[in-house]
Regions:
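N-terminal secretory signal peptides
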Residues: 1-9, 22
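Disordered, low-complexity segments in secreted/periplasmic proteins that are enriched in proline
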Residues: 32-36, 82-119
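Histidine/acidic-residue-rich catalytic or RNA/ligand-binding cores of hydrolases
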Residues: 71-75, 161, 256-262, 284-293, ...
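C-terminal segment of N-terminal export signals and the immediately downstream linker at the start
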Residues: 27-50, 54, 103-107
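Divalent metal-coordination and catalytic microenvironments
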Residues: 64, 149, 239, 300, ...
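Short acidic/histidine-rich active-site segments
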Residues: 248-249, 303-305, 326-340
Length: 383
């Protein structure tokens, strides 16, 4: 595909990288192009109300962030990450025949083509218990050009759905609640003994009671376990029953990305309803797995952006754009503060590399709405 690169002098590149937050909003929202078509009756289900997709066309939607996690999440995350690093062997061979194997990346990833922890992992004191503070964070994000944020928490990670409702009400920023079950280290003990049918029923109850707008982040922590496969199959079936879109967590992207997509497709999920997450951790100049995900119709989630891993991700994004996959990319930060950094830090680096505002608008505004919008199969239970 042509039209993504433009001549950029060194001085212009420096100026673009140095763009301030004030410049981020018009850069994302001023692109003049026809938006995507949505099915009749499609909504984006936020916690406080359902939105027509057109209502959120004025800014970016961040598809994977965190605004509520339990007080013990950091400790559990650190322990699970250490266990995964201890178990991971050498980097896996690429799944095709590109000349170089993928190397670890995405903010200090461990051997194995990525790790569970990433630059968006929480560290230090938990700031997620102050509604006013979090509301100010979202107001700042809105001023940076964010129209909507998807929270990737779950009951098993300590996500407080009422906290999110209060934050959305105070900030005026729509929050879409993800849900489901996270990954093996976080599963309730009864998951192992529950049947797949029982898990599907539990998921649908959760979607109704918590007013979910997506399933996610749904993860495999290291090698996909039997319980994780069962949960992924149940998520696929719950999607068929609800139409809610799905976004995933890949602990070792090179090993699990395509298997996750296989399981979901086998359960009846169309790939265009799925974002395979953390693929910035799979650093591969040939973007082999990334291209397969795109060709199959799913979205590649570069969702730990706005930090040190950007240097690895920008060339991969450029390769995917040049291959014609702009319609299959999603960007976010997977963070707990500073939610606008995808727009204010990462996008200027892409502009400096030659990406046009029209393409960035497609990715940040159109792709995310196309993925999030769904025609409900069940009535909204909570106003």
């Amino acid at each position: 595909m042509t039209g993504f690169r433009s001549a950029v002098t060194r001085r212009q590149a420096i100026e673009l990288i140095a763009m301030t937050a004030a410049a981020a909003l018009p850069s994302v929202t001023a692109a003049q192009q026809r938006g995507p078509d949505f099915p009749k009756g499609a909504v984006i289900r936020a916690l406080l109300k359902d939105y027509a997709p057109e209502d959120l066309a004025g800014g970016a939607t961040l598809f994977h962030e965190h605004m509520s996690l339990g007080a013990d999440f950091n400790q559990r995350f650190t322990a699970a990450s250490a266990a995964a690093r201890a178990l991971n062997g050498p980097p896996p061979a690429p799944l095709g025949t590109p000349p170089a194997a993928p190397r670890a990346g995405g903010g200090g990833a461990a051997p194995g083509g990525g790790r569970a922890a990433g630059p968006g992992a929480p560290a230090g004191p938990n700031p997620m218990s102050d509604v006013s503070l979090m509301a100010r964070e979202l107001v700042d994000a809105r001023n940076d050009g964010v129209a909507c944020i998807v929270d990737g928490g779950h009951p098993d990670s300590g996500r407080d759905i009422n906290f999110l409702r209060q934050v959305s009400m105070m900030s005026g920023v729509p929050i879409v609640a993800g849900g489901g079950f996270y990954a093996q280290p976080w599963y309730p003990t009864e998951i192992s003994s529950m049947s797949e049918n029982q898990i599907v029923d539990a998921l649908i109850r959760q979607a109704d009671e918590d007013t979910l707008g997506a399933w996610g982040e749904i993860g495999s922590w290291d090698e996909i376990t039997a319980d994780e496969r069962k949960v992924f199959r149940a998520i696929g079936r719950a999607h068929v029953a609800t139409n809610l879109p799905i976004f995933t967590h890949t602990g070792i992207p090179g090993k699990s990305a395509l298997e996750q997509l296989d399981i979901l497709e086998d359960a009846g999920v169309r790939p265009g309803r799925v974002v395979i997450g953390h693929l910035g951790n799979l650093v591969d100049a040939n973007v082999y797995v990334h291209k397969i995900v795109c060709r199959r119709g799913a979205y590649v989630g570069f969702d730990r952006q706005g930090g040190g891993g950007d240097a690895n991700v920008v060339p991969m994004v450029m390769s995917l754009l040049e291959a014609g996959y702009a319609d299959h990319l999603m960007f976010s930060a997977d963070t707990m503060r500073g939610y606008g950094k995808t727009l204010t830090v990462f996008l200027p680096k892409l502009r400096a590399a030659g990406v046009s505002d029209d393409v960035l608008h497609k990715i940040m505004v159109d792709n995310s709405r196309r993925w999030l919008a769904f025609v409900p199969k069940r009535p909204r239970k909570r106003a």
